[in-house]
Regions:
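Membrane-helix entry/capping segments
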Residues: 1-11, 15-19, 51, 243-302, ...
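Hydrophobic alpha-helical transmembrane segments of polytopic membrane proteins
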Residues: 390-409, 448, 693, 699, ...
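Alpha-helical transmembrane segments of integral membrane proteins
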Residues: 1-24, 285-288, 318-355, 366-486, ...
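Mid-to-C-terminal secondary-structure elements
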Residues: 124-137, 148-291, 491-679
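Hydrophobic, regular-secondary-structure patches
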Residues: 44, 58-119, 126, 158-163, ...
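Membrane-proximal juxtamembrane linkers immediately C-terminal to transmembrane helices
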Residues: 35, 39-63, 89, 134, ...
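Hydrophobic alpha-helical transmembrane segments of multi-pass inner-membrane transport and secretion
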Residues: 15-41, 291-327, 355, 435-458, ...
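Transmembrane alpha-helical interface segments in multi-pass membrane proteins
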Residues: 331-369, 694, 715-758, 777, ...
Length: 809
């Protein structure tokens, strides 16, 4: 019996090949896109959950508000975690990590050549107790206990030794530092908020034994015992800070923590759950750029909406097609079929369609996965698509859609009286459906909203790239490993002016396109070092060529100059710092910092530089102080217009002559600037892709419905042509109702899209306006696409021979 049902179902689907193909392709596309987005969302939600202790690990994050300056960071004082573990038995273990992304480069000797590598961290010996990453070689309990030891990941072991059995071997690091390999750990999973390639003992870091409570220079993680109450633990953290920090506040600022709080300033440290870091933390000194929970919500909604569009299409076309089968139902009933037989037949056809769609959807997902990975910046493996849990959910959803789509014709058509059906009294009422029109409106509402979102994101990215940022990022080459060249870097810089294509060059510690990681230091307005005169400013360590090389403009005063030996003790402020300090004539003012003996040292202001963006445009320009330094981490070279490629080759040749085998590792500043908005650019690309798929699915459904409508009105079209109606008139007649539905969808989409994109733009301090023309443009694009889709079928119907259509009736 079932075999017979299956054979009849397949014959029926084959008989209407066009509808069958549209139905399968539409639903498969929706399911395939939904599957890809589901993989993305699941990956984002799984961060750090590979750690079996993840739900018991917290990071201690700083929130410091001092004299109208807020400082949020993923760092804390070095003694905090140690003190908590000593004083609070609920803290089972702790680890402190020193890692700054823009300072994590490391030079390693391989063969006789120096190799530039990345992601070197310093950590306590308890690292592998808090983060139990499997070791392929070595003892996790002792691997980081000895000074000058190093633990490396599997990839690094194979890169430098072609093996993972390397415990006891030596790596030579820049500065004649020999490190003994004491462990090799598996590559850290992609869904982790850090990906260190090398880990050295914390005591080997540049901090030494800095145990000041006012220095936030490590990321501190604590592992608590099962059942620990988070609120009680937070109170313990607050009490510890008040006790120990108070002593240093009185020594340095001559104020107690209580008095400081009464003035509105505070030092707070929050417990950030490990599993929340990736999606809920966006602080200074994050190990890596984190995700955004709002994007997870947005993409989840888009996946649901695209799937709904596909399902609506599927059900729309299934019910429309079934209207032509009313007479078939009547004949089957006359021939002896029961209502149950008919219900089973219709449901089986619908389920077959949906299951075929699922198989095609998996193929679509596999084909699009490399493209999706490129657009989203993910590295989702092919095998993730075949996750049993995910496929079971999709299978269940597919069966549900098939049952819903088949239920209307199954239960409605099977209830018809044969005599009425065969007389044709039900066809007219069945063919017109307000529900079908509503579903078309819904489909194009989503499509138009996505088009508007895509245009707004594109406009904001254009605004970012065209807005004046206070420096000239064009034709600036940055060498990021200048420190590694040692003393050779100065000789290299002296030789740069001899290259005809070089305009200027600067050695500095910080670049405005590095995206964060700047030092935040306390400065005082008066020699009386106290809390009231304290300002927290961003310190940029520069030389006298920094401002001209980067094309910055002076607002007052002058730049640093070798003609003034006293400039080594001078400072340059930006306009925001002057405004914060409230100075009318800053060139007559001084700022102070304590020297080694805690006596105030004066730094006269010699100039004011115009404000420039030294972080992304999500953030407001903050107060900056520039000081002269011998820092050699970054070398920026401004190139003259002309043959850039030839000039870079000359610079590289000179670099090799002075850099003692250190590789020539460079980027261009405009590329670094673009990386600051990589996440927004990816979002824009994904929105374009989603909008294209949404429109494609909607148009497939529209094409099917127009085809159905023209089939229903074949006789009417023939009569109109016999009576002299023009082709254009008939096309307009057939398209008018559907065009009206698209316009209704546009009217609904406009306010919703405006609200959603306004909320998104609020995440930028500097943002574009939503232009009014975006809305009619999006509506016109959707209408044009819909008209092209409809015209293909309506013109064919209008050009058909009326004799043939009337004879068939």
């Amino acid at each position: 019996m079932f075999k017979n049902y299956l054979k009849v179902a397949l014959r029926s689907l084959w008989k209407t090949k066009g509808f069958t193909a549209i139905n399968i392709i539409g639903l498969a596309t929706g399911l395939g896109v939904c599957l890809l987005i589901a993989l993305y969302v699941l990956e984002e939600l799984s961060y750090d959950k590979y750690n079996p202790k993840a739900d018991r690990i917290y990071r201690l994050d700083a929130e410091i508000y001092f004299n109208n300056t807020l400082f949020n960071a993923a760092t804390s004082p070095r003694p905090l975690a140690v003190t908590l573990m000593k004083d609070y038995p609920q803290v089972e273990q702790m680890v402190r990590i020193n890692y700054f992304d823009n300072q994590s480069d490391v030079m390693i000797k391989k063969g006789g050549d120096w190799v530039q590598d990345h992601r070197l961290a310093f950590a306590d010996s308890t690292f592998f107790q808090v983060f139990p990453i499997p070791l392929l070689a070595g003892d996790p309990a002792t691997a980081l206990k000895e000074p000058h030891s190093i633990v490396i990941d599997e990839t690094a072991a194979r890169r430098y030794f072609n093996s993972t059995d390397v415990v006891g071997k030596t790596l030579e690091l820049q500065g004649n530092t020999l490190c003994k390999v004491t462990g090799v750990y598996r590559d850290i999973p992609s869904a982790s908020h850090f990906h260190f390639h090398f880990i050295r003992p914390l005591r080997d870091s540049w901090m030494g034994d800095d145990n000041k409570w006012l220095s936030n220079n490590v990321a501190s993680y604590i592992l608590v015992r099962p059942g620990t109450d988070r609120a009680a633990l937070q109170k313990r953290v607050d009490a510890t800070i008040n006790t120990y920090l108070n002593r240093e506040l009185q020594d340095v600022f001559h104020i107690s923590s209580r008095d400081m709080q009464q003035q509105g300033s505070y030092f707070r440290y929050h417990l950030m759950p490990l599993v929340d870091i990736h999606l809920h933390s966006d602080r200074s000194y994050e190990f890596e750029p984190n995700g955004n929970i709002n994007y997870v919500y947005v993409f989840s909604c888009i996946a649901i909406l695209i799937l709904v569009i596909a399902c609506v299409n599927f059900m729309n076309l299934s019910t429309a097609r079934s209207a032509n089968r009313a007479k078939e139902v009547g004949i089957r009933k006359v021939a002896g079929s029961t209502r149950g037989n008919l219900i089973l037949q219709f449901l089986l056809e619908s389920l077959l369609l949906s299951l075929f769609s699922l198989l095609l959807a998996i193929g679509i997902a596999l084909a699009l996965l490399p493209v999706f990975n490129h657009l989203s910046g993910k590295e989702l493996p092919m095998g993730a698509i075949f996750s049993a849990r995910l496929l079971l959910v999709l299978l269940g959803l597919t069966i549900l859609v098939g049952c819903l789509a088949g239920s209307y014709p199954a239960f409605y058509l099977s209830s018809f009286q044969p005599i009425l059906v065969l007389k044709g009294r039900l066809a007219a009422g069945f063919s017109s459906s307000w529900l079908r029109s509503s579903l078309v409106v819904f489909q194009f509402f989503i499509s138009i909203a996505l088009i508007i979102g895509t245009i707004v994101i594109h406009d904001q990215l254009n605004y970012i790239h065209n807005r004046r940022v206070g420096y000239d990022r064009d034709q600036v080459l940055i060498i990021h490993n200048g420190y590694a060249a040692g003393n050779g870097i100065k000789a290299f810089c002296k030789g740069l002016p001899m290259i005809s294509g070089v305009a200027d060059a600067t050695l500095s510690g910080d670049m405005p396109t590095q995206g964060g990681g700047y030092n935040q230091n306390a400065w005082w307005k008066s020699p009386a070092i106290d809390a009231k005169s304290t300002m927290v400013l961003t310190n940029l360590y520069v030389d006298d060529h920094y401002i001209p090389t980067l094309g910055m403009q002076m607002a007052k005063g002058r730049n640093f100059s070798p003609d003034y030996p006293t400039d080594s003790g001078g400072i340059i402020l930006n306009e925001s710092a002057v405004a914060l300090l409230g100075w009318k004539d800053p060139l007559r003012e001084k700022l102070y910092q304590p020297d080694d003996s805690m006596r105030p040292k004066a730094y006269p202001v010699i100039g004011v530089v115009r404000d420039f963006n030294f972080s992304s445009m999500h953030d407001k320009i903050g107060p900056v102080v520039m000081t002269l330094t011998d820092n050699r981490r970054n070398l920026a070279i401004r190139l003259r217009p002309g043959d850039i490629h030839s000039c870079v080759n000359k610079i590289e040749a000179k670099w090799k002559a002075f850099a003692n085998g250190v590789p020539f590792d460079y980027t261009f500043m405009d590329d670094d600037f673009n990386k600051l908005y990589h996440a927004e650019a990816q979002t824009g690309q994904l929105f374009i892709a989603f909008a294209v798929f949404a429109i494609l699915i909607a148009c497939l459904g529209l094409f099917g419905l127009v085809t159905y409508a023209t089939e229903q009105r074949t006789k009417e079209i023939g009569i109109r042509k016999v009576l002299g109606a023009r082709v254009t008139r008939i096309v307009a007649l057939l398209s008018r109702d559907f065009a009206r539905l698209v316009l209704i969808a546009a009217v609904i989409a406009f306010p919703v899209a405006w609200w959603a994109m306004s909320k998104w733009l609020q995440s930028f301090t500097y943002r574009t306006e939503i232009n009014w023309w975006i809305f009619p443009l999006a509506g016109a694009v959707a209408l044009l696409i819909a008209m092209v889709t409809m015209c293909f079928q309506t013109i064919r119907a209008a050009l058909a021979n009326p004799v043939s259509s009337l004879r068939s009736e």
